[in-house]
Amino acid sequence: MAANIIATRATPKMASKKEHQYCLLDSQEKRDGHYPFSFELKPYGQTGANIIGVQGSLTHVIKMTVFPFMIPFPLQKIHIDDFIGGRVYLFFKELDVQAISDVNGMQYHFEFKVVPVSSNQVELLPVNNKYKFTYAIPEVQYLTPIFYDLSGPLNFPLDTLSVHVDSLTKHIQLPIQNHNLTTGDRVFISGYKHLQTIELCKNNKIFIKCIPPLSSEKIKLYIPKNRIRIPLYFKSLKNV
């Protein structure tokens, strides 16, 4: 008895190529109104105006790599020994479905060794700087990094502040609390090209001599020693 054989053509596999994208998450370009950190990534754009520019698109992401970077001492820490186990963990909120789960429900993507650099900064050295996703991430548009140690989330001193100009004394006054600034610290002022130093810190107010006339509405103060820049590298799959 003859058997009927139905032949089917195998579906051809889609060829794919890998694309590589670098980006630098700069705390001075975080999204407005999002504290402590949240970033918007713009494909084929430039970094600036609260946007992190990326050379290409971040779709079908299969691997993420992080490189060493520095952070200021968190508000909860005073000495290097305050970092429990000498480790800090980094978790990206938008990628929570694919993250390492640890004790007490903590999740993270990267683990770092904490290395002292100065009295107010430490360097984070990745223990394993690559994270491979089990399933490709369809698109990365926003990233919200959260730092932990075994005691809980870490908060950092502000690196960008809005200012008030006293028209009588011609000083810039910053009525803020929990800052880590001292007399002589260098700061940058938007709308004014010269580097300034803090003249006085008193009663939770920082005074900076203002030489040219400045408008309070247009001024922001940038504090270099509190700046955090996270260098990332992404590998994506693209169908061709």
UniProtKB/Swiss-Prot annotation:
Protein's organism: African swine fever virus (isolate Tick/South Africa/Pretoriuskop Pr4/1996)
Main location: virion
Function: Forms the penton at the fivefold vertices of the icosahedral capsid. Together with the minor capsid proteins (p17, p49, and M1249L), forms a complicated network immediately below the outer capsid shell, stabilizing the whole capsid.
Induction description: Expressed in the late phase of the viral replicative cycle.
Membrane-spanning segments: none
Family assignment from sequence similarity: Belongs to the asfivirus H240R family.
Coiled coil, from the record: none
GO cellular component terms, semicolon-separated: virion component
Keywords for the protein's UniProt record, in alphabetical order: Late protein, Virion
Location in the cell: Virion
Name listed for the protein in its UniProt record: Penton protein H240R
